[in-house]
């Protein structure tokens, strides 16, 4: 990530919320540099199971795409990025983490990502072997087993992707649009995130992380 400092962030946008029968809504926001949407449930049930969520994007032609492709949902997000045309990314190929960067033209890019993720799984993407991709989500794990040093493996999964509050907002799905420089400088993840729940954060100071990979310790 590129370190940036802002005294203020302009959060101007146009919005629209569409309500449906069954106790749910879809909220849309249009910014100068991107678009976003999210689902909202307004049901009376205290808890609900989410069977799935579909997010699909189709571009007008085969374009260059930059993505990180892990071997499964259990990932450290440390895989080397792949650079290929969309037509080379089929549904049976490795899926991708977020974000995904699409080169729409020589000077214009589209960054696909999410924001305000809470009590819900991360979204992954699969290609369609043509000019688009669709979402895929891990199922809720029900049973774990040992899997080596500091690791667990999933022994049993549910047939749904989330068990969560019945009345809530769900994660934002957004696409930032701009030149490569503008994509680096965009702040849509922050603009779409929920306000901080800790209030004044001036007391927070950087320090060591209790993990030998990050704080430089040599335990062996």
PLM regions: where:
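N-terminal accessory beta-strand-rich subdomains and adjacent acidic, glycine-rich linkers
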Residues: 1-185
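An acidic-aromatic substrate-binding cleft motif
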Residues: 161-219
């Amino acid at each position: 990530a590129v370190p940036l400092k802002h005294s203020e962030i302009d959060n101007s946008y146009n919005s629209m919320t569409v309500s449906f029968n069954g106790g749910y809504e879809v909220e849309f926001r249009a910014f100068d540099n991107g678009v976003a949407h999210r689902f909202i449930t307004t049901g009376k049930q205290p808890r609900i199971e989410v069977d799935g969520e579909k997010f699909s994007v189709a571009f007008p032609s085969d374009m260059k795409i930059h993505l990180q492709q892990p071997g499964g949902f259990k990932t450290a997000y440390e895989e080397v990025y792949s650079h290929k045309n969309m037509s080379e990314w089929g549904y049976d190929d490795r899926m991708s983490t977020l974000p995904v960067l699409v080169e729409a033209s020589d000077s214009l890019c589209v960054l696909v990502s999410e924001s305000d993720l809470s009590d819900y799984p991360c979204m992954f993407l699969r290609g369609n072997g043509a000019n688009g991709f669709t979402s895929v989500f891990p199922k809720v794990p029900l049973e774990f087993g040992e899997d080596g040093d500091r690791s667990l493996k999933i022994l049993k999964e549910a047939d749904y992707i989330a068990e969560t509050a019945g009345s809530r907002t769900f994660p934002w799905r957004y696409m930032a649009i701009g030149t490569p420089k503008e994509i680096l400088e965009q702040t849509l993840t922050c603009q779409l995130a929920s306000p901080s729940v800790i209030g004044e954060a001036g007391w927070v100071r950087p320090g060591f992380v209790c993990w030998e990979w990050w704080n430089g310790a040599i335990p062996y």
